[in-house]
């Protein structure tokens, strides 16, 4: 895990670390396009993996936040599924059947589709063993907790904050503040590690120092 730049002057040693998930701790084993196309084919829809991979980043950038204030339980799950269904339709360029929406939602909940970056387990164990409080802060939904469990990482974290249930997504400071409250730490006692401009902006807005990593 390499950082974009070393802090100067040195920052005080943190008591806790907040970490982004996708692109920082974990990544997909195969492209989004390959998975979308394979599942779409099971539902009788032809889709080109390369075209999906080209469209997907732009669709996500233009999407409203994956955040649903005031919702929980089944209502939150329904909102998460609907949000992703709209993205699926936009990527495929057609109104896909609800069954395909649900199949893709469930497919990306499968830990076997994901990989932990090689440096992550040892680094997390070292931090955890040193007594640092650890939390995940991610622009994702409630599938993340079972994903981390399936990937063998969940026990290393004191809390997992996802935008869908936090009611706000990075670059909002709200997910960071929820994590800080859960860890019982002040912003000055914590660093955030992420990989995107949203990580940096959200952390700064919450008063948290941020390091950005660059993955190949």
Question: What residue ranges belong to the model's regions?
Answer:
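Structured helix-beta-strand junction loops
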Residues: 111, 130-131
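N-terminal helical cap/lid subdomain that shapes the substrate entry/recognition surface
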Residues: 7-118
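Asp-based, Mg2+/Mn2+-dependent phosphohydrolase catalytic module
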Residues: 1-17, 27, 41, 50, ...
């Amino acid at each position: 895990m390499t950082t974009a730049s070393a802090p100067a002057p040195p920052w005080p040693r943190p008591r806790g670390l907040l970490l982004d998930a996708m692109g920082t701790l974990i990544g997909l084993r195969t492209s989004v396009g390959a998975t979308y196309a394979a599942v779409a084919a099971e539902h009788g829809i032809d889709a080109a993996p390369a075209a999906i991979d080209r469209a997907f980043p732009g669709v996500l950038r233009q999407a409203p936040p994956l955040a649903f204030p005031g919702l929980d339980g089944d209502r939150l799950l329904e909102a998460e599924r609907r949000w992703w269904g709209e993205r699926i339709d936009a990527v495929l360029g057609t109104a896909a059947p609800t069954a395909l929406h649900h199949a893709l939602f469930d497919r990306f909940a499968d830990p076997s589709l994901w990989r932990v970056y090689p440096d992550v387990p040892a680094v997390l164990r070292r931090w955890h063993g040193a007594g640092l409080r650890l939390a995940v802060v991610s622009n994702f939904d409630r599938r993340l907790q079972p994903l981390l469990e399936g990937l063998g990482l969940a026990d290393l974290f004191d809390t997992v904050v996802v935008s869908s249930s936090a009611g706000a997504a990075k670059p909002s400071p709200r997910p960071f503040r929820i994590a800080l409250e859960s860890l019982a730490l002040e912003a000055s006692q914590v660093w955030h590690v992420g990989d995107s401009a949203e990580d940096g902006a959200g952390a700064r807005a919450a008063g948290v120092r941020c390091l950005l990593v660059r993955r190949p």
